[in-house]
Regions:
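Interfacial aromatic-anchored transmembrane helix boundaries in multi-pass membrane proteins
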Residues: 49-64, 85-119
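Aromatic-anchored segments of alpha-helical transmembrane domains
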Residues: 1-3, 45-53, 88-94, 135-144
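Alpha-helical transmembrane segments and their helix-entry boundary regions
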Residues: 68, 80-84, 100-101, 130
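Alpha-helical transmembrane segments in multi-pass membrane proteins
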Residues: 40-48, 72, 80-83, 87, ...
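Hydrophobic transmembrane alpha-helices
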Residues: 1-69
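Generic transmembrane alpha-helix motif of multi-pass integral membrane proteins
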Residues: 23-26, 64-80, 114-118
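Membrane-helix interface segments
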Residues: 34-37, 77-82, 123-128
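Membrane-embedded alpha-helical hairpins and interfacial helices in multi-pass inner-membrane proteins
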Residues: 1-15, 101-102, 117-210
Length: 210
């Protein structure tokens, strides 16, 4: 009897998620980072993780996505990815590890990475585009995590199942998107100014360009 498609996906997808992340960590290591380069990533990862734990009682409402986006904006795509990935790993040490951890590490990592990319294009000078990115990132995060549920627990995997999963999660996805928008509105300006001063003063991360 041949292997079922869902069984194959359960093996292949985690490997792919790991392979997606490895180049980011290798690229950072190849830069030969100094301790001062590690501090912003470590501190923001911990802040994001603790913020997620503090708001754990409110499903999908947390500041972690906003923190990750700010990290990417201020320190570049690579630092944004690492902050997102490590904050997911750290927060799940408090909230519980599982097969979803790799998915969250990848989703938050890419959220921070693209924030860094878009910041460099200058589009985030328009605040409405920044807040729109934050809101949509929360929605897309939820849809991405739906794939983990579908691949892990649903068979056969059909388009109907995908649509049903997205409909069922819409309340949580909206909560995530709205909370990200709110925390960006509250935190991005004051934190951005302070982080920019630190970046310029100590010449860390994005100053040396990625």
């Amino acid at each position: 009897m041949g292997l079922r498609t869902d069984s194959i996906l359960k093996v292949i997808v985690p490997v792919v998620l790991i392979l997606v992340q490895i180049p980011f960590f290798i690229a950072f290591e190849m830069k030969k980072p100094k301790p001062r380069d590690l501090m912003p990533i470590a501190v923001l990862s911990v802040i994001g993780a603790l913020g997620r734990a503090v708001f754990a009682a409110i499903p999908s409402f947390n500041p972690n996505s906003a923190v990750v986006i700010i990290a990417g904006m201020q320190f570049g795509p690579l630092a944004g990815f690492l902050t997102g990935s490590l904050s997911a790993l750290a927060s799940n040490m408090l909230l519980g590890q599982g097969p979803w951890t790799l998915w969250q590490m990848t989703a938050w990592g890419m959220m921070g990475c693209f924030a860094g990319v878009f910041q460099r294009t200058g589009i985030f000078k328009h605040r409405v585009l920044l807040y729109s990115y934050g809101f949509l990132s929360g929605i897309l995060f939820g849809w991405f995590m739906n794939l983990q549920y579908l691949i892990g627990y649903v068979y056969p995997l059909t388009m109907g199942a995908v649509i049903a999963s997205c409909v069922a999660s819409i309340t949580f996805d909206l909560a995530h998107g709205i909370s990200t928008l709110i925390f960006l509105f509250i935190l991005e300006r004051p934190w951005g100014k302070k982080l920019k001063r630190l970046k310029v003063k100590y010449g860390i991360l994005d100053i040396r360009r990625e």
